[in-house]
Regions:
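A structural boundary/capping signal
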Residues: 1-185
Length: 185
């Protein structure tokens, strides 16, 4: 027998068991991360870069500091900030909110990641909407906005936020047919 001492033998079994359990945990965690961050939509893959880090929290709070908890003001202030960032096609995967701000450009997925990250840290229910060759954000606002159209999902009112149109306002008109919506994430 390789190990004569019973105590050492049991300790080695325990260490082996803990190691194997840890490896299995890492593998399962990795699958979960990939499943939630890389989403296949037809023949393309969307990379979720939504972040709720300190940078995004400070940015969202700074942009909404003059809104006195007015939800429409908060959403529009964040949307205004994002739409002022120049649109430029990014051939690589979607970038984080901080990267978009620091590099001062982004395409639809970059700018939508920035916008939805800020909305999430401020507590808004918001989702990505994927349509052919484009992505935009929808946000739930309890307040009904007069003379503006909303999308209703599970009886909740959502307004379209278009991050790539300079000066875009809440409730941007839907430029796609409903059957062109590939996913709401």
């Amino acid at each position: 027998m390789l190990i004569e001492n019973r105590f050492l033998k049991y300790i080695s079994f325990l260490i082996s068991f803990i190691f194997i359990t840890y490896v299995i945990y890492i593998i399962i965690s990795s699958f979960s991360i990939v499943k939630n961050q890389f989403i296949d939509i037809g023949d393309t893959t969307y990379v979720n870069q939504v972040r709720t880090d300190d940078y995004t929290i400070k940015l969202a709070n700074h942009l909404t500091k003059d809104c006195a908890s007015n939800k429409v003001c908060e959403v529009q202030a964040m949307l205004d900030f994002v739409t002022k960032i120049p649109y430029k096609i990014n051939e690589s995967i979607a970038r984080s909110a901080k990267q978009v701000v620091e590099q001062n450009f982004g395409d639809c997925d970059d700018k939508s990641n920035l916008l939805i990250s800020m909305l999430k840290v401020k507590g808004y229910e918001a989702y990505f909407v994927l349509v052919p060759k484009h992505i935009f954000v929808i946000v739930n606002l309890e307040q009904k906005l007069q003379n503006l159209k909303a999308l209703y999902i599970n009886e909740k009112r959502f307004y379209i936020l278009e991050s790539t149109a300079i000066g875009s306002k809440i409730a941007f008109p839907l430029k796609y047919n409903f059957n062109e919506i590939e996913a709401i994430l």
